[in-house]
Amino acid sequence: MPPAADLRLVVGYDGSPPSARALDAAVSLLRGRAGGIEVTYVAHLPSMAALSAGAIGEMETDFDDIERELRGMAGEQLAGREERWVLQRRQGPIVEELLAAAKDAATAHADATVVIVVGSSSQVTHRVLGSVAVGLARHSPVPLIIVP
């Protein structure tokens, strides 16, 4: 990829080893370029039809705790390496929300090149049923990097 004048990297991040590798790759991609990293945590609720209002509220509190933990993990991983990052939390289906985050980044930075960066999954269920990376590969209107 030729150096972009402004590179905006949307990194899918959940604290897992694949997402940590994706974040490391984003740091390498951004080195020497203008831009920033949008570390994106997607809080995904299962089908809410079977959940009570109390259960949904409790899950929201859990998501707040997870967001704080992930912000700390990302901060530690990026400390001394990259300071141009923000963590955003989105809620909904993971693929749809990462695509929406990329669209929002493109809208906010009209002259930037937006790239989604995610880690690959080695879980058998993901290989059989599909993973976030596969869903993004099928639907992403922006460049996508899947880090092994």
Enumerate the predicted regions with their spans.
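Small/aliphatic-rich secondary-structure junction motif
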Residues: 2-53, 139
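Structural beta-alpha unit
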Residues: 1-4, 76-116, 123
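Short, well-ordered secondary-structure micro-motifs
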Residues: 22-23, 49-52, 97-100, 127-129
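A short acidic, glycine-rich active-site loop
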Residues: 56-69
